[in-house]
Amino acid sequence: MYRTMMSGKLHRATVTEANLNYVGSITIDEDLIDAVGMLPNEKVQIVNNNNGARLETYIIPGKRGSGVICLNGAAARLVQEGDKVIIISYKMMSDQEAASHEPKVAVLNDQNKIEQMLGNEPARTIL
């Protein structure tokens, strides 16, 4: 049996831009992509903390160190600049792999710089 497990998460990223006229996707600072083991063109889920919207799209790498988090195309209708979002990637794995799997979670500050790296999510609330 295979399970779909969270593999990486950018927690509380700040949307820096919403570009309705670009062809779909989310542009993410390449340093952030690397930090949580995501890949260009990988499918991700995005959860908007401000309005509850959830959507799926794919990653386009943005300039390293820029802090860019830009929702493109139709996704731009579901966010506004300054919104806090959670960006999640998932992997399929066997029960055996899942038993020892530790996702990479980056908690970001308001400038989309990594404040803290976590493995398994803590049992406490992170604000």
Swiss-Prot record:
Localization of this protein: Cytoplasm
Modifications the protein undergoes after translation, according to the UniProt entry: Is synthesized initially as an inactive proenzyme, which is activated by self-cleavage at a specific serine bond to produce a beta-subunit with a hydroxyl group at its C-terminus and an alpha-subunit with a pyruvoyl group at its N-terminus.
GO-annotated molecular function: aspartate 1-decarboxylase activity
SUPFAM superfamilies for the chain: ADC-like
InterPro entries associated with the record: Asp_de-COase-like_dom_sf, Asp_decarbox
Free-text cofactor note: Binds 1 pyruvoyl group covalently per subunit.
Main location: cytoplasm
One GO cellular component term: cytosol
TM ranges: none
EC number(s) per entry: 4.1.1.11
Active-site residue list: 25, 58
Pathway where it operates: Cofactor biosynthesis; (R)-pantothenate biosynthesis; beta-alanine from L-aspartate: step 1/1
Catalytic reaction list: L-aspartate + H(+) = beta-alanine + CO2
Modified residues (Pyruvic acid (Ser)): 25
GO BP: any one term: pantothenate biosynthetic process
Obligatory cofactor(s): pyruvate
Keywords linked to the UniProt accession: Autocatalytic cleavage, Cytoplasm, Decarboxylase, Lyase, Pantothenate biosynthesis, Pyruvate, Schiff base, Zymogen
Annotated substrate binding sites: 57, 73-75
Subunit and partners: Heterooctamer of four alpha and four beta subunits.
HAMAP family xrefs: PanD
Role this protein plays: Catalyzes the pyruvoyl-dependent decarboxylation of aspartate to produce beta-alanine.
Family: Belongs to the PanD family.
Protein name, per record: Aspartate 1-decarboxylase
Organism annotation: Bacillus subtilis (strain 168)
Top-level taxonomy: Bacteria, Bacillati, Bacillota, Bacilli, Bacillales
